[in-house]
Amino acid sequence: MMYFVYLLSILLVLGFMAFASKPSPIYGGLSLVLSGGVGCGIVVSLGGSFLGLIVFLVYLGGMLVVFGYTAAMATEEYPETWVDSTVFTNLLIMVGMLGVIWYYFSGEVDLSINYDLLDLGGVEVLGGDYNGVSLLSACGGWELIFSGWILFLTIFVVLEVTRGEH
């Protein structure tokens, strides 16, 4: 299972590097959506099934609309892909910087996997995500109400900004 998490972590870093190499907005949005799915897969494989599902639904439900809108507004006749020279050069520079940082902080380049990721000393009846939801409703109830109120006001601000001159 840890090999799977390790593979997903590598895919997450590669997805963020694919976004940071500045391709066309269409490909940038695609790499962010795929990276979000991989990140939620990491959370699910580490035991946070509820949290991973909620983040996946919120991320893809909310942000996919934004990505679709920006991709429609920023259409190009010849979009830059990941194999174009400037984008590929940026990607190679980031891979080189990642290798230098890895070498600098580790002292040597060593491909080892730390299996002691979570310290599970005792038996847990509930996962951390269920405890977090119950704490949000109990101790953090005022934060939940405040966040809902802010979102409610945001709707009115957006409607006022986008309102026509009629």
Swiss-Prot record:
UniProt keyword list? Electron transport, Membrane, Mitochondrion, Mitochondrion inner membrane, NAD, Respiratory chain, Translocase, Transmembrane, Transmembrane helix, Transport, Ubiquinone
| A Pfam short name | Oxidored_q3
Top EC class of this enzyme:
translocase
**Membrane topology category:** Multi-pass membrane protein
Report what the protein is called: NADH-ubiquinone oxidoreductase chain 6
Molecular function in Gene Ontology? NADH dehydrogenase (ubiquinone) activity
Subunit description: Core subunit of respiratory chain NADH dehydrogenase (Complex I) which is composed of 45 different subunits.
Its main localization is mitochondrion
Q: Where in the cell is it found?
A: Mitochondrion inner membrane
Is the Electron transport keyword given for this protein? yes
**What's this chain's function?**
Core subunit of the mitochondrial membrane respiratory chain NADH dehydrogenase (Complex I) which catalyzes electron transfer from NADH through the respiratory chain, using ubiquinone as an electron acceptor. Essential for the catalytic activity and assembly of complex I.
Listed transmembrane segments: 1-21, 26-46, 47-67, 87-107, 139-159
GO biological process entries: mitochondrial electron transport, NADH to ubiquinone; mitochondrial respiratory chain complex I assembly
Indicate the family of this protein.
Answer: Belongs to the complex I subunit 6 family.
EC number(s) recorded for this UniProt protein: 7.1.1.2
User: Which organism is this entry from?
Assistant: Ornithorhynchus anatinus (Duckbill platypus)
Instruction: Give the GO cellular component terms, alphabetically.
Output: mitochondrial inner membrane; mitochondrion
The reaction(s) this protein catalyses: a ubiquinone + NADH + 5 H(+)(in) = a ubiquinol + NAD(+) + 4 H(+)(out)
